[in-house]
Amino acid sequence: MQINNYNTKYSQIIVFDIKIKRIFVANNVLLNNTIMKKLLLLAFVLCSSLLCRAQEERVILGDEQTSEYFPILKDKRIAIFSNHTGMIGDKHLLDILLENKFNVVAIFSPEHGFRGDADAGEHVSSSVDKKTGVPILSLYDGKSGKPSEASMRKFDILVVDIQDVGLRFYTYYASMCRLMDACAEYNRKVLILDRPNPNGHYVDGPILDMKYKSGVGWLPIPVVHGMTLGELGLMVNGERWLPASRTCNLTVIPCKNYTHQTLYKLPIPPSPNLPNMKSIYLYPSTCYFEATPVSLGRGTDLPFQVYGHPNMTGYSYSFTPRSVPGAKNPPQLGKLCHGVNLSNMSDEEIWKRGIDLSYVIDAYRNLNMDDHFFRSFFELLIGTDYVRKMIKEGKSAEEIKARWKDDVEKFKVQRKPYLLYEE
């Protein structure tokens, strides 16, 4: 797999240039000025070549390609669907558009709010962006989650620029789909500025049984779908998954220098409890604890990287959830929990396992709570009814995973026409 890290490559180039000079000093090599100048020129050319190559290999996001989408936005009333992740370098998309005299009339904000600091599921009121004065229309204000007719009449085109993590129960894509539906209904255009999927290198999990459709499961896709938001938007249109089989007028600005084997490391945490790549990689396996009494580390420095409960026994690791920004009232608040720390697992081991239900099975068997362990939210997260049944029957994680293997292969074939990037 290709790991995309431009800063690392640039640092290596600088170090290479310094090492050339140090070699001569360390070995007391005396060269006349002409030879030294030629050697330094050669080193400069080589370093410049390596730097150009590093720049060519760097993933270029959709929002960075302003020459591609500025003409589309000319003379349009613009709404954006974004949050704190919608950055172009050190500036937000909103600021870039306003600096270039575009008419931004509204911001639609997802779960966690426009600034990305609200708790999971917390109601966030609509407001006004203090810096720019642009109205923020919250999709998580406790109402329908779909924008009103009045808000839809304000703009001509919706620009989507938000970092997703590629999981069916991560809510940003569901908010995007609701906006696509509204845009289809009111004949508004949609422009997705695509971003890499940090979990885009594999597909895993059961396809959602649509009787469990909810805010944490909006489409008939596996838990780990392996698609970018741009690809997913194209699939929503192509498969006519919007209500009443509607389609919207959709344009996608794809990333450059990106494939589904590019392991893209996010420069900004996408939400308060996914603070780093380890949390993002373990999220597909540990999120199910949200539907149990077990703590998954909210209120600690290791959210989604640990799990435990005050009554779990036989473990050497323990932690105590606290009230912190982004997790004001976490499960098992203030209680000493005993359990497992997964944060020391290598990324490679996590990728090899994919979705690993052994953690949930371990806690279920240890606590011996039977029907009191799972809440109905579990089916909304996993997307089917057979997983809970198989766990209660004593089946292993491998046996359960074998059950959804056909779902994974079916979806890979179904999604293929909509992929923008090499698998």
Question: Which sequence ranges carry the predicted segments?
Answer:
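Bacterial Sec-dependent N-terminal signal peptides
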Residues: 1-57
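Short internal beta-strands
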Residues: 105-111, 193
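Glycine-rich, charge-decorated loop segments at or immediately adjacent to ligand/cofactor-binding or catalytic sites
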Residues: 116-121, 191-213
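Glycine-rich oxoanion-binding loops at beta->alpha junctions
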Residues: 125-155
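Glycine/threonine-rich flexible loop motifs
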Residues: 164-176
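Conserved anion/nucleotide-ligand pocket segment
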Residues: 213-283
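Glycine-rich, aromatic-lined ligand/substrate-binding cores of catalytic
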Residues: 256-333
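Conserved functional hotspot residues or short segments at active or partner-binding sites
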Residues: 303, 307-405, 423
